[in-house]
């Protein structure tokens, strides 16, 4: 028997009955006329739907334009308006697909002559005209045959292909905005006027149809849209800042590294870049002293090991395979460059019998790993194919697991604080659909990590934000993900802590317990920086190249005003080097202001200026990157001050601890 009413639960917990066929707009009007006027969509049990849709049983929310969820609708609708604008301006242009993406939207177009950046202001102007018309979005459901016939008649061949790709039995929705229409799953807001004017078209790019290089090249137009003009302005400001801070540009200006076609996705480190990289490794190495054994596992291993670990089945397409043209015994073997360090560390743990008294065993490695990334995804230091991972694996008992996770957390947070990151978010990623290991093992791991997550939040007294990422765990275990916020508000996921009951079982790893029985250890994967290359890129962008003195690739330049001060300048440089600083000299016959400007471009943090007076007084004049101020002090004071400032945070703590004893 057909139901004649629909039960809806409202955010305040109240439940009301509505007649079948009641729309979202009807429900909004039943609450208040003002709410109905502000409404742009509804959400039924969390799913966004059109206001014009008939409601179904569940929890209902009326979504207004100010709602965070409305931003996706604003961007989606803006993409449709952009497509209409393009076809009004250039009749005959075919529209293909136009999804919402992070911070905006895009649409791909098939046009004889590709769009150029000069076309964007013209399209924007037409979009504002269409939005001002405030035409309603209306939805129709068409048959497959009708849709193909209509789009074919319009010359929209790509739309015909999209219609063919829609599974049988699935509704084929057509959305109108005035006379213009498009194939779309929806939902949309009530009218084009609700989009507002806080949008901007950003750039044009080429894109193959369906992402396949065998298909025609289309023109993609990217745009962004926001609730308010203030939000748009802030976003554009962040983009401008990000461009100024782009680590690829800074890498060139500071002479740190480069990439080239012969080695796609691998870094050519220059002297200064390698110096800063090694400073980062040295710092991390000191932070592990006393707690970890630093090890090194082979770069190339037989595929049988990766088959045992499960990587060959789950990750093979991202691995670099190596075949050996050697003697007969090797001819048929297939090897792979390691994409991860964990299987190698298990082999080290298994080498020799382990007692429960030796646990936890903590193995750390600054391991070079290789993972295939499509060429289009490569992005400077942030996305590479070969990188160094500050990896560690802890082998412990079930009872030690929670304490080890908390110990790792303390180390991770301390490292991030040393590098100047104050805002941290820790999220627990739970089991994905595709995974290895039994549900029982996953239940155990997730229960422990949920408890640890609660402890992290409590111990931080709310300073560390926490959350859950359902289904985002690795295929072999749940994990914590640590996300940093940088100087311009961008978020970077870096550290991970992952409990793994599965890999030790696959490799038959065990220890001897107090009853002389074999027991399987818990394995905890952890990384703090993650990719050292990527973390260095994040640091460069966070500080806009103006690195803290302790990790700056070149800490001081001693520059002379006159050749009469060159001998004194050499003495100053030598004193600073003896104090542990990285120093270069500039005795060229150039004006001092020219020298200062030139070294500022390469982000030298401290310039020590010496002239005739400084040589006579045995003093120096210190200039700082980004400041017009000049500080005069004696040479002894300068050496003491700069050497103290250039000391790494962990070494300062160690020094202060010794002084307090």
Swiss-Prot record:
The gene is thrS. Homodimer. The lineage of its organism: Bacteria, Pseudomonadati, Pseudomonadota, Alphaproteobacteria, Hyphomicrobiales. The keyword Ribonucleoprotein does not apply. It comes from Rhizobium meliloti (strain 1021). It comes from the Bacteria. Belongs to the class-II aminoacyl-tRNA synthetase family. It is found in: Cytoplasm. GO terms for molecular function: ATP binding; metal ion binding; threonine-tRNA ligase activity; tRNA binding. Zn(2+) binds at residues 342, 393, 525. HAMAP family: Thr_tRNA_synth. Keywords: Aminoacyl-tRNA synthetase, ATP-binding, Cytoplasm, Ligase, Metal-binding, Nucleotide-binding, Protein biosynthesis, RNA-binding, tRNA-binding, Zinc. This is Threonine--tRNA ligase.
